[in-house]
Structure formats: structure tokens, C-alpha cells
Amino acid sequence: LWQLFAELREKFAFDGFIDLHDVLRTKLLGLFCRLHGIKVSVINKGRRGKRALTRRHSKVLLPLQSTRARYRQAFHRIGLPVTNCFHGLYGDSAAAPAEAYAAICRPKSGGTRWIGIAPFAKHEGKIYPVDLMEKVVGTLAAIPDTEIFLFGGGEKEAQVLDGWAKRYRGVRSLAGKRYGFPAELALVSHIDVMVSMDSANMHLASLVGTPVVSIWGATHPYCGFKGWRQSEDDMVQLPMTCRPCSVFGQKPCFRGDYLCLRGISPQSIVDRVVRHLPPARGS
């Protein structure tokens, strides 16, 4: 780390260091900076508040500051104020040009409703049960003039999504097709609504201006990680006293049944999706 610091200092001659990670390695880099008179700003991750929010007993269920705000404060403390001028990954454009996703499908036609579904996440505590999600897919697929795009990665996920695509009309799996991240993100910018877990797909869809119906289990929006400009009405979750049990969803369910997810009805998800769909053709 000392060698890394020396190389960075020699190459860039920086006069400020912003630590947006606040772990042992970045703490050491910050120490080296301070020893050389370089101004340091460290993000406040709010660890104490997160512990109070996720502990099993005497839980303090209050919304914490968003991670975006914590980033802004870290820049501000070092003299680099961040203005709130972000309009999405595609700038002032509502979406990416149609040719950007041409490798995946034809351009969207008038009256067609496009729905994206990203049903997986890194940890079990953040994944809506597959059997229940299939009911969501089947119900949405029965809506006229609707196409559903399934997003996922990995062999096991691809098998599940390919199975759904075979069983339901107008459902297409993109898992394992290797269209590339830019093309898939461009497609997401054109869909009417994305169904996602508390995962990267939730954030990516939000960043391209697509409404997201997010499903929350072991984690909670109060931890500060909800999607950019996401409506609370589109966050599907149950008011359980044990929620949230962790910030990132990695802890096993102490109940053993993940009722926080299995207790969510497929229809409650469908209802939130439908209100984002445009009118059907001829209506």
C-alpha cells in the first residue's frame, strides 16, 4: 500500500483524497495522505445506525441517510460540492437510441407493453421464491400486447429463465445470450417497468429512467440503498418486526422460512406492475 501511495502521488500529484469505501486498506492510504499534508475526506457509512436498524432485538426502524447523500457529503467536505444535475445515464434523452439494442430485438412499436424482470440477487434473503415469481410471469404474460424480457446470469439462472420463456407466450430470456451490457441497458431504457430484487438491476433501471417495482425481503429501503428516484409505492415489502435483518441480505433467516419474501403475494407485485403499463392498442 505504501508503494501504491508513492506511485499515485508521483504520477498525479494530488492534493486531496476522498475515501468512499472506509475499509482497512483505504484507511491506511488516508493515513499516508495525512502524514504528507494531503487533505482527506472519509465517507460516513452510518454503521451505528445500520446496526440499530438490523439488530434482532430493540430494533430502531427509522430511515437512514441515502448512500448517494453520503457520497455527496464526502465530496463537499473536501471542497468539491456536487450539484444535483443528473438526468440519467443517457443525459437529457428519455432513452437510448433504438439501434443500441438492435441486436436483441426490433424497435418497440406503438401499443406494445414491455416488461423487464430480473428475479435474482446475490443472496437468498433478497430473492423472491422462484415458484411465486413464475406466477408473476405467467399472469403478466397473459396481458394482451405484452412482451416480457427476463434478465439474469449464470447457468442455473439461465435454466430457470429459459424454462419460463418456453412455457409462456411473449416471454424472452436474455440470460446467457451474450448481447453485451450496453445493448441490454439500452433495452432497459425502453421497457415500461422493471421488476427487480434489491439488486444491481434495480439501480441500473432507475439510472436510465425506467420505473422499478422492487421486492424487499431481508433488506430494507431504510438502509439507504433504494433506487434513484424510486417511488415508495413501488417497493413491495411486508411489515415484519424482524425486518431488516441485514444490510446486504447475506445473513440466513433465523426463522428458517424467509416469510418476508414468501409472504408477498404474486398479485401484489402484478398490481404494481400493471399501473405502469401504457394503454393497449385501440383503447
Please give the residue ranges for each predicted region.
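Catalytic machinery of carbohydrate-active enzymes
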Residues: L1-S283
